Amino acid sequence: MAVRKLKPTSPGRRFQTVSDFEEVTRSTPEKSLTEGLTKKSGRNNNGRVTMRRRGGGHKRLYRIIDFRRNKLGIAATVAHIEYDPNRTARIALLHYADGEKRYILAPLGIKQGDMVQAGEGADIKPGNAMPMARIPVGTVLHNIELYPGRGGQFCRAAGTYAQLVAKEGKYALLRMPSGEVRKVLAACCATIGQVGNVNHENISLGKAGRNRWLGRRPKVRGVAMNPIDHPLGGGEGRSSGGRHPVTPWGVPTKGYKTRDRKKASTKLIVKRRGQK
């Protein structure tokens, strides 16, 4: 995948870059693996805003992705590499030997016609999935389970990966994209390789409207609000807010540690991110 720079025919296109989609082989999804997607606009089941600055955006069809990789011992052929509007990574359509079709995250380097497999007997090559107990130390992984059978939860965005750095008893030690080293049960499954579409981080949206197409709304600064709306709001003319940065609910932000010290998974973190 390469990044294509647009000609500066307008201010919005001057710094805009787009993917060339060279790895994508089909534009329409597999109908049996799609379902309708209702926009939530950042609201929960009570209709209250739980995620600010969300709303609008282009209509989408949800692609059902196999994060569990629980079809064991059956070889599959990569039929197509497709674009998915619901995530930054590309997805691969698999045709299994028994006739079933499934979508998976497309790893870096996978192409149309390749064979992939899941299970303890699978080869160590991109796209194959197996428990981490069977994976050699030093291997690059993605779509990593946190609990056995729950499905991959770590390293699913474009270009991300974790590295298996050691094994200790029933645990595998992973170096996460953030630099954190943490223990995960070695019985958990992971997929070999790095997530594809690695140049996604180099895309420049170029204009505000392109953010709106993605369903992202403007972010208003606290100091620009009224005092009823934010602790930093109000004042005559332009003001600095008069206190350390806080959220609209008064919780310190911009560097303030908010992680629960008593969180159960803290004991599984060997090295915090940012530590030497």
Swiss-Prot record:
It comes from the Bacteria. Residues 23-33 have a biased composition (Basic and acidic residues). Keywords: Ribonucleoprotein, Ribosomal protein, RNA-binding, rRNA-binding. InterPro entries: NA-bd_OB-fold, Rib_uL2_dom2, Ribosomal_uL2, Ribosomal_uL2_bac/org-type, Ribosomal_uL2_C, Ribosomal_uL2_CS, Ribosomal_uL2_dom3, Ribosomal_uL2_RNA-bd_dom. Residues 21-55, 224-276 are annotated as: Disordered. Residues 259-276 have a biased composition (Basic residues). GO terms for cellular component: large ribosomal subunit. Gene3D superfamilies: 2.30.30.30, Nucleic acid-binding proteins, Ribosomal protein L2, domain 3. One of its GO terms (molecular function) is transferase activity. GO terms for biological process: cytoplasmic translation. Part of the 50S ribosomal subunit. Forms a bridge to the 30S subunit in the 70S ribosome. Belongs to the universal ribosomal protein uL2 family. One of the primary rRNA binding proteins. Required for association of the 30S and 50S subunits to form the 70S ribosome, for tRNA binding and peptide bond formation. It has been suggested to have peptidyltransferase activity; this is somewhat controversial. Makes several contacts with the 16S rRNA in the 70S ribosome. This is Large ribosomal subunit protein uL2. It comes from Nitratidesulfovibrio vulgaris (strain DSM 19637 / Miyazaki F).
